[in-house]
């Protein structure tokens, strides 16, 4: 049963907390949703219950933040109720790796807590990996995502260098990927999105500062990825200028605004920054996204692609949804700027790639 009605949890033997853990204004952890959920849960907590946190967070959250709030119930964690952390491991839009087939990490505040949580997850997961503590499980999740963040920052920075050098970054990545060992493929793009990747480096950096340690390399990767949409706006401006058009007054059509292909999730989508900056420069904005019918923040609705293609001064491919015929886009648009590399193999004078 999935619910946000806390009274409905009174009869449950196990509760899994999956609330958002965003960043506050100064890029520090905002655990407000978690604190509220824990406070409400403490009022209906009963002896023998299992509580598992799945929300992405910094090491120590389960033991230092969640546990004391739950113990306001008068029950002791590890003796009268069980508490564990098990990071969410899903990739929205993918069907080849499911909850059942993806190994599940579990760390409890005691061995018994870990055993109880593992017992629960074995009902739905083929493999459960038990670790020694919630802190290990919490940091495991951050490592998985920061590994991606750092490597995406690397190829995004390489893309900016290739832009200056006149080298096709996609050809470089494709060539490097032919090496059967020692290289893992990551692709550049307009920036990172989703509820985890853009956030996680700053969660770890926050906790590291408590220990008088500064994760400079990790934070730099986060900053590079945060800045990538601005580079894309500059690339749009330069591409229009090379076509003898100013960005002010030009009609720019964004193809795809969700943070990744095949989904309608707008959380931390780089398209939002791109639209905002282009509007500040005076551009007229339209977008087409089969998964995002409305952008209320900008009072925009997804436009009919066929109707918009011919009237746009520039079409920017921001999210490469599989439903779109990109050969047709290049054929019918006046100018195309591809930030996702989906036009590799197409040669056309009106086509520019990241």
Model-based region annotation:
Residues 1-354:
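Structural/interface elements that position substrates and couple domains in central-metabolism enzymes
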């Amino acid at each position: 049963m999935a619910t946000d009605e806390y009274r409905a949890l009174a009869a449950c033997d196990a509760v899994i907390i999956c609330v958002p853990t965003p960043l506050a204004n100064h890029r520090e952890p905002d655990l407000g949703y978690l604190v509220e959920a824990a406070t409400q849960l403490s009022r209906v907590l009963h002896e023998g219950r299992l509580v598992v946190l799945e929300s992405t967070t910094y090491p120590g959250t389960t033991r230092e933040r969640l546990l004391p709030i739950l113990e306001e119930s008068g029950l002791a964690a590890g003796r009268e109720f069980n508490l564990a952390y098990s990071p969410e491991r899903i990739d929205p839009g993918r069907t080849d790796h499911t909850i059942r087939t993806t190994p599940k990490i579990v760390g409890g505040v005691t061995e018994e807590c870990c055993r109880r949580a593992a017992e629960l997850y074995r009902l739905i997961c083929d493999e459960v990996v038990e670790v020694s503590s919630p802190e290990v499980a919490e940091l495991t999740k951050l490592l998985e995502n920061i590994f991606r963040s750092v490597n995406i920052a690397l190829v995004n920075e390489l893309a900016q260098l290739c832009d200056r050098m006149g080298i096709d970054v996609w050809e470089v990545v494709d060539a490097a990927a032919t090496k059967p060992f020692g290289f893992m493929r990551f692709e550049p793009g307009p920036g990172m999105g989703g509820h985890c990747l853009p956030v996680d480096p700053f969660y770890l950096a926050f906790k590291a500062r408590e220990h008088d340690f500064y994760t400079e390399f990790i934070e730099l990767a986060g900053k590079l990825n945060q800045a990538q949409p601005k580079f894309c706006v500059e690339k749009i401006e330069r591409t229009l200028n090379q076509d003898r058009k100013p960005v002010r007054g030009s009609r720019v059509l964004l193809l795809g605004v969700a943070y990744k292909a095949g989904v309608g999730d707008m959380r931390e989508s780089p398209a939002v920054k791109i639209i905002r900056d282009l509007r500040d420069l005076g551009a007229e904005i339209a977008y087409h996204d089969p998964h995002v019918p409305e952008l209320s923040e900008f009072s925009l609705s997804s436009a009919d692609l066929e109707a918009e293609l011919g009237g746009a001064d520039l079409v920017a491919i921001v999210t490469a949804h599989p439903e779109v015929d990109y050969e047709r886009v290049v054929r019918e648009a006046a100018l195309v700027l591809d930030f996702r590399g989906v036009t590799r193999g197409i040669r056309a004078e009106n086509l520019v790639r990241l």
